[in-house]
Amino acid sequence: MILEHVLVLSAYLFSIGIYGLITSRNMVRALMCLELILNAVNINFVTFSDFFDSRQLKGDIFSIFVIAIAAAEAAIGLAIVSSIYRNRKSTRINQSNLLNK
């Protein structure tokens, strides 16, 4: 596998995630874009770990750690979104200011 191709793929995923996170008005879509960013970072960890030192598994282990953190973040984020939806009947970011009411 060519290093440049994987890095370009990761950069595309990261850019799509950042663009979606900036322009998203829906909380669920923002969480999905954040997960896309974390997956792009994981691709970089695994790629550099394989390319520079394939005998050690530091990048792979760190990638598994990031996946576990991302799963916990997604679970907590979706719980918060469902709680806000139950109270506000909307998942739009600009309508969920909890300090107003």
UniProtKB/Swiss-Prot annotation:
Record membrane topology: Multi-pass membrane protein
One annotated GO molecular function: quinone binding
Enzyme Commission number: 7.1.1.-
Transmembrane segments: 2-22, 32-52, 61-81
Enzyme class (EC, first level): translocase
Gene3D superfamilies hit by this protein: 1.10.287.3510
Location within or outside the cell: Plastid, Chloroplast thylakoid membrane
Stored Pfam families: Oxidored_q2
Cellular component aspect of the GO annotation: chloroplast thylakoid membrane; NADH dehydrogenase complex
GO biological process terms on file: ATP synthesis coupled electron transport; photosynthesis, light reaction
Reactions listed under catalytic activity: a plastoquinone + NADH + (n+1) H(+)(in) = a plastoquinol + NAD(+) + n H(+)(out); a plastoquinone + NADPH + (n+1) H(+)(in) = a plastoquinol + NADP(+) + n H(+)(out)
Keyword flag Isomerase: no
Summary of the function given for this chain in its UniProt record: NDH shuttles electrons from NAD(P)H:plastoquinone, via FMN and iron-sulfur (Fe-S) centers, to quinones in the photosynthetic chain and possibly in a chloroplast respiratory chain. The immediate electron acceptor for the enzyme in this species is believed to be plastoquinone. Couples the redox reaction to proton translocation, and thus conserves the redox energy in a proton gradient.
Assembly notes: NDH is composed of at least 16 different subunits, 5 of which are encoded in the nucleus.
Family that this chain belongs to: Belongs to the complex I subunit 4L family.
Name used for this protein in its record: NAD(P)H-quinone oxidoreductase subunit 4L, chloroplastic
Source organism (scientific name): Eucalyptus globulus subsp. globulus (Tasmanian blue gum)
Gene field: ndhE
